[in-house]
Amino acid sequence: MASFMRSLFSDHSRYVESFRRFLNNSTEHQCMQEFMDKKLPGIIARIGETKAEIKILSIGGGAGEIDLQILSKVQAQYPGICINNEVVEPNAEQIVKYKELVAKTSNMENIKFAWHKETSSEYQKRVVEEDEEPPKWDFIHMIQMLYYVKDIPATLKFFHGLLAANAKILIILVSGTSGWEKLWKKYGFRLPRDDLCQYVTSSDLAQILDDLGIKYECYDLLSTMDITDCFIDGNENGDLLWDFLTETCNFIKTAPLDLKEEIMKDLQEPEFSVKKEGKVLFNNNLSFIVVEANV
């Protein structure tokens, strides 16, 4: 690995912009919307049974777009029931955006919001240190955030222990069938790493849950990321997408020529992408893992 390559996470503003470009060029949120519309109602069908209040914990809620979709489904399932929605999110900018989104969204009257600017591990530490009994939750969701957890088995075990009767955890992350799995396995050791992020897919998560003896169901949904601009020399959008794909700041400018050529060639191969109507569509398949409370 060339010493002048550095992690994308070392430049916060560039990371935020590259992530925005990823969302704009992928079907990520549409894929999540499809799951929320078709699968989520059945998953949450019993979480609020006989309860005067439904408690929801969002780990890594970001700017709240998907959180509000989830809340609308819970409201539809349990009309009039008070919902207590707590958000654990380490990024202050994202919390501001989340609050702005709530402020301009209608039908939020029966939902109480609380935001905690902290990581999931900081939340765990705070809960453990408090003398009172840890709170129980009816629904916990972790959307595209397990990559930023150092000890995934311990994290899953902890939050599984916070589930109330009939409660569920929803975890969303990239599928083991996605191009990400192949990209990380083949090139991860040649790209700059830092402690903030690790490579994990649904295949890894299934093994962890099996080892912990935790019951779960997994749903895979198709998603793509349009990386056509990545193959246009000097294209700003393409350069930012390269940064997101490789988690490398200014990948095109700083990566060794041989590495760039190899990845560029591979990402156009069928195991990574499909070519359709002149576009190169990277396999961004997502997995939705639903974890159940102990009976």
Swiss-Prot record:
Keywords: Cytoplasm, Methyltransferase, S-adenosyl-L-methionine, Transferase
GO terms, molecular function: histamine N-methyltransferase activity; N-methyltransferase activity; selenol Se-methyltransferase activity
Modified residues (Blocked amino end (Ala)): 2
Subcellular location: Cytoplasm
Reaction catalyzed: histamine + S-adenosyl-L-methionine = N(tau)-methylhistamine + S-adenosyl-L-homocysteine + H(+)
Binding site for S-adenosyl-L-methionine: 60, 89, 94, 120, 143
Sites where the protein binds substrate: 28, 284
Entry-linked Pfam families: Methyltransf_23 (PF13489)
GO annotation (BP), single: response to cocaine
Cellular component terms (Gene Ontology): cytoplasm; cytosol
EC number, as in UniProt: 2.1.1.8
Keyword DNA repair: no
Function: Inactivates histamine by N-methylation. Plays an important role in degrading histamine and in regulating the airway response to histamine.
UniProt record similarity statement: Belongs to the class I-like SAM-binding methyltransferase superfamily. HNMT family.
Subunit details: Monomer.
Name of protein: Histamine N-methyltransferase
Annotated organism of origin: Rattus norvegicus
